């Protein structure tokens, strides 16, 4: 039997018995970010969040925006989108597990298709790592 990669193990976990963390836990975890930054969300009240949605964004520096977006959607609307993450996230010991625990999956076309097939809301930043690490002049 072939040995599965850590990313494959995490994907199996994410699609197996994924149980979302409590909204309160995510909200507490993001408290330092909310204290430092003041994110503003516009137009979400016009969405029918009883149906799956695809949230697409551009990353801010160091990718802190993803957690703030998840926190807001989950605590205010009860929606925890599943994030499509760069492959690197799932190679970092401990971090890959944390991303998976909060609904993240490796950003592959197959995983995106599976989330859509399951009727999940999805959060994706198409610019990925390239966008997170861009210089001010880019």
What would you call each of these model-derived segments?
Residues 1-72, 77-110:
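Membrane-anchoring hydrophobic helices of lipid-metabolizing enzymes
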Residues 51-56, 115-138:
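Conserved Motif II region of HX4D acyltransferases
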């Amino acid at each position: 039997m072939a040995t599965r990669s850590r990313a494959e193990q995490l994907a199996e976990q994410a699609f197996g018995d994924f149980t979302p963390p409590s909204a309160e836990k995510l909200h507490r975890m993001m408290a330092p970010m909310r204290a430092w930054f003041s994110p503003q969300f516009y137009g979400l009240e016009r969405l029918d969040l009883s149906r799956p949605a695809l949230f697409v964004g551009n990353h801010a520096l160091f990718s802190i925006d993803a957690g703030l977006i998840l926190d807001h959607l989950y605590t205010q609307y009860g929606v925890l989108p599943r994030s499509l993450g760069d492959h690197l996230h799932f190679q970092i010991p401990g971090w890959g597990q944390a991303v998976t625990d909060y609904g993240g999956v490796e950003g592959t076309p197959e995983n995106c298709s599976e989330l859509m097939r399951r009727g999940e809301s999805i959060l994706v930043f198409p610019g990925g790592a390239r966008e997170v690490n861009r210089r001010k002049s880019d």
